[in-house]
Amino acid sequence: MPLNNVSGSAKAGNTYDAIVIGSGISGGWAAKELTGRGLKTIMLERGRNFEHIKDYKTAAKDPWDFEHRGSVTQEQRKVRPVISRNWGAQEPIMDYWVNEQEAPYHEVKPFNWWRSYQLGGRSILWGRQSYRWSDFDFEANAKDGWAIDWPIRYKDLAPWYDHVEKFAGISGSLEGLPQLPDGHFLPPMDMNWVERDVAARIKKNYNDTRHMIIGRAANLTAAIPGRTQCQFRNRCWEGCPFGGYFSTQSSTLPAALATGNLTVRPYSIVTRILYDKDTQKAKGVEVLDAETNKTYEYYAKVVFVNASALNSAWVLMNSATDIWPGGLGSSSGELGHNIMDHHYNLGASGTVEGFEDKYYYGRRANGIYVVRFANLFGDKRDYLRGFGYQGAASRTGWSREIAEMNIGAQYKDAITEPGDWQIGIGGFGELLPYHDNKITLDKTRKDKWGLPILSMDAVIRENEKKMRVDIVKEAKAMLESAGVKNIETHDRGHNIGDGIHEMGTARMGRDRKTSVLNEHNQVWDAKNVFVTDGAAMTSSACQNPSLTYMALTARAANFAADELKKGNI
């Protein structure tokens, strides 16, 4: 691919129509849309170059092929202590996560920030659940009188949901539910025998007010040009050589490169956006080369900030001037505030009797989804907003006998047979935006490159605590209603970041006095700067947000291209 390695001495050689900061899900979409509209674009990625297929070095390995059989060493944990708190500490993907000793952050309150600094970002590692938001979500703040109103509604984003779904490839079922709009889907994956049975029982016992459906996933169930359908390996996080799921590498990057309009520059830490006081617009960005520590400047007519919710805020805050001492976009006092996430680490599981003669095909890279029902259609709780569940049913394997005191041939024969059916569902719930949930620049602490780090100060509050109690209670009740036995519940607590859906910090709004971005994702303080990743979110809904990032980005990029053509920016 075209890589930019210019010296930085010649301005003409460093001038483009558009700059995209970041190469993850939203950055990839920005590059695809901008280059598709004919704009010469440079994508700046702070991490290493990472090529599709070639760099998926563990994707073809079996567990026994790894030195530590999939586990990680204490030395590896020291390098990545935050990742080691959760499931991300796995030998096949440890190198995909950021070196936290080189790029630390400060926790005023416990905060789990999962970062992947490489071309493609976390698009290689994401869970691929892809759900549209509805007007229940876009209108929630206004109806509840909480925070500020979204400046858009579902109708504004619906055609862009269509646009990104058709390109990305989303498998799913048509359900006709107003709180979870249907989309442009590939054929759905199949629910297994137990999932279908449990879903039918829940639907019947709750009078058709609760719906367990197959997940809507960015995994192909039919091949499309340049990509093969999902192989049901369920090892997506190692990278898919088949292009079976959507990522920057498999999808948006090849499309952008095919236009001939994209240049990619890895190892490029954008330290600040260059603001022109006379035009009141950005004129480019300053870049620190992560390998050489040399500084360069790149210039463009439009800048898209897609570094992920927290890093995008870092770039804006670090772009302070005498006009904007709090950073570019700070005029409202909301930059860095209103951090959100999703509830995680809670739910219920149990055993399903029967179905001993049933099994399932392969390792489906998807699960089931229980659609939101709380605080909708006359249902009223003692908290605001709602939640959904994700989970799956499966049969236990040989590991069920690890703690048993058995030996001999009979024992060996027993563990070759599938065990009992089990089903589990975990809650994903909405967190409200709070001004006091914030990040700030800590200039007393520096990273490997001498740059100020982020300080995290965010916690869940009373509304979230009430919701967590209800999530667990309803999970147990639904499984009981479906005849599930030996039900166990869990709530392991929640630190912001656990859901890996960090949002907020540069929210959209209708008024520049209370928001950072307008209805087109333009920074109020510099109309040629756009932010379209998680930073832009005004509320968090309970659905996975990545599909909405894609739609917002495609919408904003095409708006930017139109405005450039008109000479408005």
Question: Which residue stretches match the model-derived regions?
Answer:
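Aromatic-residue-lined binding/catalytic grooves and analogous aromatic/hydrophobic interfacial grooves
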Residues: 28, 243, 248, 364, ...
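N-terminal glycine-rich phosphate/pyrophosphate-binding loop and immediately adjacent elements
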Residues: 2-141, 146, 151, 155, ...
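Short, glycine/acidic-rich hinge or "gate" loops at secondary-structure transitions
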Residues: 52-55, 171-183, 485-494, 566-569
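A glycine-rich dinucleotide-binding beta-alpha-beta segment and adjacent secondary-structure elements
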Residues: 213-220, 228-236, 271-274, 278, ...
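Glycine-rich loop(s) and the adjacent beta-strand/alpha-helix scaffold that form part
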Residues: 36, 40-67, 259, 268, ...
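Conserved redox-cofactor binding core of oxidoreductases
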Residues: 67-112, 117-118, 127-132, 137, ...
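FAD cofactor-binding and catalytic pocket of flavoenzymes
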Residues: 94-122, 126, 132, 150-154, ...
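A conserved FAD-binding loop/helix module that cradles the flavin
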Residues: 539-557
